[in-house]
Amino acid sequence: MEIKCSERLIIPKEYKTELDLKETAIAIKEVKDCFERALAKQLNLIRVSAPLFVRCDKGLNDNLNGVERPVKFTVKDDNEAAVEIVHSLAKWKRMALYRYNFNADEGLYTDMNAIRRDEELDNTHSIYVDQWDWERIIKKEDRNEEYLKDIVRKIFKAFKETEEHINKLYPFLGEVLPEEVFFMTTQELEDMFPDLTAKEREDAITKEKKAVFLMKIGKTLESGEKHDGRAPDYDDWELNGDILFWNPVLNKAFELSSMGIRVDEESLLKQLKLANCEERKELQFHKMLLEKKLPYTIGGGIGQSRMCMLFLKKAHIGEVQSSIWPEEMIKFCEEKGMTIL
């Protein structure tokens, strides 16, 4: 049975935005400018230009959960070469670090735009994706959990700095982040809440802790289920995670970032086999990785519009980004006090 868009929406009781359209536009820029500077400083990153589309035969696009269809087209003046709009730049960034000759503990970030045509549209999901995609070179010996946690803490400092900046400009919005981030694995979370679904578990722990880094996503848990899917060829499933914040407007856990230490040659082979995707070994990116030509890296994506939603207390992602929405959803949101851009 088809589910109406309005039935997927969370409608906060007596919702009323604190900022009008013009004020929102100004505040969005404040959020983005502040966080971009803070992230670059914390992680020693420089900004680089990023592609909107990549060639299909290079293996550079992010396959996400493995079922999402990329938008494809051909280029007339390049012998009708097949290209596809990116889902994210997870693999492209690692290749870029190699080409730019970055050193260990240096990295890059991009202002990434993507189209995810198969997203189910609701308060937090849009077919238009805008995020900071970042990647940083690490040493082989840095491929461990403590290094991962250290990077997460640095990113959390950038979040805190941004929230404090926005709260000085708009004190009536209030702050939502705690003083520190809480770390937990997906298996520990399943053990704690065995009778809940994955999303219900995230809600339960994030409501309590307010800021959580949920680790080890993509692997099969003791229950025989995965907490969530991850492509086998960028994150190491033992060394990755999601940054979750409690969203008081929507009353649910809110994913702001998916990130991780990237696969090395051993974990790539292992995960490709587990995912039944061993044919990818013949793609350019994968060949270079297996031949140890690419640097060891850590990286992730951080949602720009979701961050604006959280800090500006917005109930729908369409209040902070311009995208395409069903007319039914636009009308329903307007009736409930959510002005879609």
UniProtKB/Swiss-Prot annotation:
Named from the GO MF annotations, one term is: transferase activity
Question: What are the BP-aspect GO terms?
Answer: L-asparagine biosynthetic process
Swiss-Prot/TrEMBL keywords:
Amino-acid biosynthesis, Asparagine biosynthesis, ATP-binding, Cytoplasm, Ligase, Nucleotide-binding
Pfam families reported for this sequence: AsnA
By its UniProt entry, which InterPro entries does this protein fall under?
A: aa-tRNA-synth_II, aa-tRNA-synth_II/BPL/LPL, AsnA
Q: Which reaction does it catalyse?
A: L-aspartate + NH4(+) + ATP = L-asparagine + AMP + diphosphate + H(+)
Its Enzyme Commission number(s) read 6.3.1.1
Give me the Gene Ontology terms describing cellular component.
cytosol
Task: Write out the pathway annotation from the protein's UniProt entry.
Answer: Amino-acid biosynthesis; L-asparagine biosynthesis; L-asparagine from L-aspartate (ammonia route): step 1/1
Keyword Nucleotide-binding listed? The answer is yes
Which cellular compartments is it found in? Answer: Cytoplasm
Predominant subcellular localization, coarse grouping: cytoplasm
**Family from the record:** Belongs to the class-II aminoacyl-tRNA synthetase family. AsnA subfamily.
- HAMAP family xrefs: AsnA
- Official protein name in the record: Aspartate--ammonia ligase
Q: Which organism is it from?
A: Clostridium tetani (strain Massachusetts / E88)
